[in-house]
Regions:
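Glycine-rich phosphate/adenylate-binding loop and adjacent beta-alpha elements
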Residues: 1-53
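Glycine-rich helix-loop-beta junction characteristic of Rossmann-like nucleotide cofactor-binding loops
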Residues: 79-84, 107, 169-170, 208
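Adenosine-nucleotide cofactor-binding segment
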Residues: 91-94, 106-192
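C-terminal hydrophobic helical "lid"/dimerization subdomain
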Residues: 188-191, 198-207, 247, 251-310
């Protein structure tokens, strides 16, 4: 059984429209957003409304069931993006959600999926395990002021555009950018992402180079106050689209994780570390806060397997 851990009011207009993820009365387990806090899920047993419990296939490993929640975010982002088969995609952030956004884009027929992260190991993993087609390691640069920060974002966008895709051509401009970091520089680069754009390009050059009508999906949650080049988006109708949690995604997620196609991403590889018993919860959270473990292995998705009750 996989729990959809948000419990909406089921009475408001948003719930009636199927957009219960933005229900004002939502109570979300393990979240401190609302008060009084709802019970968390790190318990041996828990009572949860049957409506939000989803039965897993008998042959599905529990680790895959644990991916349904982040996969739900990816599916919700995909649906809001309007991505269609044959389009090109850029994903900023190669954590669990970013990898799953890339995976969904590939499964849904994206022509090229580029994944970008500051961690070279993560983007290499993404390509090796078939989550993405092309990897890009984002340089660790920070601007000392707004102008320098925007210049770095344009430079990053230009470098992405010069990458070589599976057909041996330049990636160029992309149709949809899934921004899964919440980092200001990545949101800026997502707006700018273009083909053959030099780091000293003018605002006019940018408006001519970036895909008109493209979308930047705001999946990651970072600093709530950010400086963005809105003119670069507005004058070419590049949409900035918010993504908050998920709604009506678990059944499709189960279908995706149940697929056996050889070209699909290796979803099991996403679960890199396992801990047994609630006594190890602190160790599990400490591991989840790392990018690599003591042996130098990547840390992506960490799961806690509770001991069965007697």
């Amino acid at each position: 059984m996989a729990l959809e851990v948000g419990v909406p009011c089921d009475e408001c207009n948003r719930c009636a429209a199927g957009r219960y993820n933005i229900c004002a009365g939502m109570r979300f387990r393990s979240s401190a957003k609302s008060f009084p806090h709802f019970q968390g899920t790190l318990q041996q047993a828990i009572n949860h409304p049957a409506k939000w419990c989803h039965k897993l296939p008998g042959d599905m490993p529990m680790e895959l069931g644990a991916l349904l929640e982040p996969l739900g975010v990816a599916l919700h982002a995909f649906r809001r993006s309007g991505l269609v088969k044959g389009q090109k995609v850029l994903v900023f952030g190669a954590g669990a959600v970013g990898l799953l956004c890339a995976a969904v884009a590939k499964i849904k027929g994206a022509r090229e999926v580029v994944i970008a992260d500051i961690d070279a190991g993560r983007v290499e993993f993404a390509v090796k395990k078939r989550f993405a087609d092309t990897a890009f390691t984002v340089p660790m640069k920070r601007g000392k002021d707004v102008d320098e920060g925007l210049a770095i974002a344009r430079e990053t966008a230009a470098e992405v555009g010069k990458l070589t895709d599976r057909e041996g051509k330049e990636v160029g401009e992309v149709d949809v950018c899934f921004e899964c970091t919440g980092v200001q520089a990545c949101v800026q680069a997502g707006i700018y992402v273009s083909n053959n754009l030099s780091s000293n390009a003018t605002e006019t050059d940018i408006r001519q180079a970036t895909t008109p009508g493209g979308k930047v999906m705001l999946v990651g949650m970072g600093n709530p106050i950010q400086t963005l080049a809105l003119s670069a988006a507005a004058l070419r109708e590049v949409d900035l689209v918010g993504v908050f949690r998920y709604a009506n995604t678990y059944q499709e997620g189960i279908e995706i994780l149940s697929r056996q196609a050889s070209e699909d991403p290796d979803f099991m590889a996403l679960v890199t570390h396992r801990f047994t018993g609630l006594d190890n919860a602190v160790k599990a959270f400490e591991m989840a806060g790392k990018t690599k473990d003591e042996s130098g292995n990547l840390v992506l998705k960490v799961v806690i397997q509770t001991e069965k009750a007697e």
